[in-house]
A protein has these predicted regions:
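A short Gly-Trp-Pro
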Residues: 1-7, 12-142
Length: 142
């Protein structure tokens, strides 16, 4: 299993993405909701993989909820970068491929557009359990 790294601009939130997939094979999705479009989100995840979200400063993790309020959108409070989103008490995560160190391998590929406006909260959670990666949060002291 390979480990890939990424972070927000200031480095307070970083990602270790463990997957058997090489970046050229990462599934790419573009949610068409206003929030994701405004943040140029390029979603990726691997249900067989795992993501460790490392908090260099736990105060830097800003959680934002809207719409069905079942998802925490993870934004760095210091630099404003949207790194991903979690559901079910941080059990599942999707990451923003644009924050990964290997993002150049993702750009230029066609992402699957997703319109999810008609999903109920229960349907969203079920879909995310199937598509998103397992998540663990590691809060480290300075």
């Amino acid at each position: 299993m390979g480990t890939y790294h990424g972070s927000c601009h200031c480095g307070d939130l970083s990602i270790e993405y463990r997957t058997d997939l090489v970046p050229a094979d990462w599934p790419l999705r573009e949610c068409q909701c206003k929030f994701c479009r405004k943040h140029a989100m390029l979603s990726t995840s691997d249900p067989a993989g795992e993501v460790v979200l490392i908090l260099r400063d736990s105060a830097a993790l800003n959680r934002y909820r809207f719409a069905t309020r079942v998802t925490d959108f993870l934004i760095c409070a210091r630099c404003g970068v949207y790194v991903g989103a979690t559901v079910e008490n941080d059990s599942w995560i999707v990451i923003n491929g644009r924050v990964m160190d290997c993002a150049a391998a993702l750009l230029g590929r066609t992402a699957e557009p997703r319109v999810l406006d008609n999903e109920s909260a229960e349907e969203r959670i079920a879909r995310r359990r199937q598509l998103w990666s397992r998540c663990r949060i590691d809060a480290r002291a300075h």
